[in-house]
Amino acid sequence: MFSAQHKIHKEKGVELSELDEQVAQAFFDLENTNQELKSELKDLYVNSAVQVDISGGRKAIVVNVPYRLRKAYRKIHVRLVRELEKKFSGKDVILIATRRIVRPPKKGSAAKRPRNRTLTSVHEAILDDVVLPAEIVGKRTRYRLDGTKIMKVFLDPKERNNTEYKVEAFSAVYKKLTGKDVVFEFPITEA
């Protein structure tokens, strides 16, 4: 029968880390034990998993999923993340689609670069993936006197209860993946 190895597809020649094996095993276990996720998880797999340290000794697990399967993952995102967080107790789980950045074409080259492969587009898409149950309702970029930039991202206040405890994890993961500082806030709504 199948094993946990079928739940992770790495690039050729890349060894599986211990965390990759644990995540693949968790997906395999969920597919076999959880009836409501069984049919959806049957055809899904992951590319890799990375552990990110958050302040206060907490950790987050970033699971990279194939770009083609991102819509299928979005349908079951909330339930899947809840189950994975139970399996990896005390760690936040964040699902991100694997995307590639292509360098700008050389001068005189006829080849065009697709918009979704630019650095800006990939970083914005990663930001959307990181905060997924919530939606981004606004962004502000603040330039400090010393030249550093901080991006303020405003999240949908309706999802405050589901995502407020993960805001630190969102910032740490986005900083690790892109190198950019970001602060997440919920705008104040007038009643």
Curated annotation (Swiss-Prot):
GO BP terms in the entry: translation
InterPro entries named in the record: Ribosomal_eS7 (IPR000554), Ribosomal_eS7_CS (IPR047861)
Domain of life according to the entry: Eukaryota
GO molecular function: mRNA binding; structural constituent of ribosome
Coiled-coil parts of chain: 15-50
Residues of the signal peptide: none
UniProt GO cellular component terms: cytosolic ribosome; cytosolic small ribosomal subunit; nucleus; plant-type cell wall
Pfam families: Ribosomal_S7e
Keywords annotated in UniProt: Acetylation, Coiled coil, Ribonucleoprotein, Ribosomal protein
Protein family per UniProt: Belongs to the eukaryotic ribosomal protein eS7 family.
UniProt protein name: Small ribosomal subunit protein eS7z
Protein's organism: Arabidopsis thaliana
Gene name as annotated: RPS7A
